[in-house]
Amino acid sequence: MLGALEGERLSAQGQKMAALGNDPRLAAMLVSAKNDDEAATAAKIAAILEEPPRMGNSDLGVAFSRNQPAWQQRSQQLLKRLNVRGGEADSSLIAPLLAGAFADRIARRRGQDGRYQLANGMGAMLDANDALSRHEWLIAPLLLQGSASPDARILLALLVDIDELVQRCPQLVQQSDTVEWDDAQGTLKAWRRLQIGQLTVKVQPLAKPSEDELHQAMLNGIRDKGLSVLNWTAEAEQLRLRLLCAAKWLPEYDWYQRLMMKVYWQRWKRGCCHI
């Protein structure tokens, strides 16, 4: 995930990370900086996460807006190791920098009681009265896993605009297409799902699924639910029953299944089933 290894050896990035001597995630964030402003921002984030605020405020954005002497000193040390002498820390760069090193800790709210699901599938939680708990999406780089609860406690997090983050970091998103049977309408429906790890970012109708996907989904739906899911007209139902009897009485013929598939596809092409 951090790009530190190539096979069983350190990659070029891994060697840079090791030279910094930081926590691997923080080192990955630091070496990912592409310019001086990103480096200055990453250095300040790292300083805050190494020595988090003790006032109980879990908002990383609030902490970042402060200029604590210890954080400034540590930031300068890290920038010196990176051979960076300029640059300004910029709050608009925090989310994409964090996402590169803590993608598995992107979190989406589940319920109104401060509970979140992380992209890695784990649960996490804030106090229900924490101001951050009003927001649907967070990145939570600092967690505490206790023994009393299956959910980790979020110690420090940043609220994020998920659409903006996806636009700036498209590599975070996996895309999958699904064609499935809709029981309510008796038709096939196709969806495109965008996910970050185990979190669904967006689900949207898929306009033109492949014929193979349609065919397989149709077969799966009929196999699971039976032929009754096809919304037969009275005439078509009578024909189906007659063919069922014919297949029972004349088992040596194999025309029944082929004919049924042909009938269905003709109905589908005429628009009886809509995607």
Predicted regions and their residues:
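Short linear motifs in exposed loops
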Residues: 127-128
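Accessory beta->alpha helical hairpin/"wing" motif in late/C-terminal subdomains of nucleic-acid enzymes
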Residues: 6-34, 40-43, 114-116, 122-124
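Acidic, serine/threonine- and proline-rich low-complexity intrinsically disordered segments
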Residues: 5-6, 35-120, 131, 136-275
